[in-house]
């Protein structure tokens, strides 16, 4: 899995190649049943423009989190993008949303899938850098794209 983090831009980017067609990847990426396999079982996701997204996560030693937002772009089988706001239990939710985008493009032997998380610069002061760095760790620890790859390739 390729990972790049552009600290000056507060941009997180991961990419992986999956041995499957874009349509096969899309089936796992853009369905609740599919997402339950690789992202979370505590998930609400409405797969249409303006649709709601909400995910509950418990991170041992760190706390209980709710991530929520709405679908801003859905272009089968090329892109799924949604806003992302964090609410840690006992704290106020973020005042603004960031953006998470999954993009698919055919490769010679399958599909390149990228995950990009942007918009941290809209958060206030030190919160921007803290959340940016925390989300790099979070996406890596969750092995999000590796989990998607495993789910897609197992279904073939």
Which residues does each predicted region cover?
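Hydrophobic ligand-binding cavity/cleft-lining segments
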Residues: 1-44, 48
């Amino acid at each position: 899995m390729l990972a790049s983090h552009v600290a000056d831009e507060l941009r997180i980017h991961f990419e992986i190649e999956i041995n499957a067609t874009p349509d096969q990847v899309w089936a796992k990426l853009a369905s609740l049943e599919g997402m339950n396999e690789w992202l979370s079982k505590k998930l609400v996701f409405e797969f249409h423009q303006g649709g709601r997204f909400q995910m509950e996560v418990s991170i041992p030693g760190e706390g209980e989190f709710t991530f929520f937002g709405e679908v801003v772009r859905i272009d089968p089988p090329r892109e799924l993008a949604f806003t992302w706001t964090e609410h840690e239990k006992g704290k106020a939710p973020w005042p603004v949303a960031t953006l998470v985008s999954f993009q698919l493009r055919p490769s010679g032997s399958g599909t390149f899938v990228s995950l990009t998380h942007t918009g941290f610069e809209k958060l206030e002061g030190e919160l921007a850098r803290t959340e940016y760095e925390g989300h790099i760790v979070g996406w890596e620890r969750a092995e999000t794209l590796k989990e998607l790859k495993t789910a897609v390739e197992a279904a073939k």
